[in-house]
Amino acid sequence: MNVQKVSFIEVSYTNNDDIRILNAILSSWFSDPKILHFTAPNHQYPFKISKWISLSYTDQNIITFCLKLDNWIIGHISMKLNAEEKSAHLFHLIIDEKYRNKGYAKRLVKHVEQKLIDKEKFNRLSLNCVKKNQSALALYQSLGFSIVKEKKHIKMVKDLK
């Protein structure tokens, strides 16, 4: 039996090598406009890394992690930290289509939660989800997130205490 190694790496949208790799991966994942809309509703198709960075990654309080299976990146998540409120906002969670519904998104969110609890002493997570993205809503609810507001998008929160 071939056991695959799962690991997590922190990447930066200010590092040119990371940007090059992320551009290749995200361009592939976002070749479907529906996937881009579910992940980042404010971004227009086709995906452009420069627009992605300028709209979402100019704040220095953003941390991004990728999930690797063996040496292949199959997942991405970002969070914006608010140290004053001891909270973080999750965004841009995506798993490569071939690896969806296998628990990798759950592992990626749990990894981020543990980082926040252990190292940063944060106690609250929030996120927004597109209403039509039922699989994401089910994932977040299974992880203990609660719906706090429904408008154009669904706002969810989770206490980490």
Q: Where on the chain are the PLM-derived regions?
A:
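Acetyl-CoA-dependent GNAT
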Residues: 3-92, 96-98, 109-111, 115, ...
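Conserved active-site alpha-helix within GNAT-family acetyltransferase domains
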Residues: 106, 131-149
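Short, Lys/Arg-enriched, disordered terminal segments
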Residues: 1-9, 119, 159-161
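Conserved G/P- and acidic residue-centered "switch" motifs that form tight phosphate/ATP-binding loops
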Residues: 103
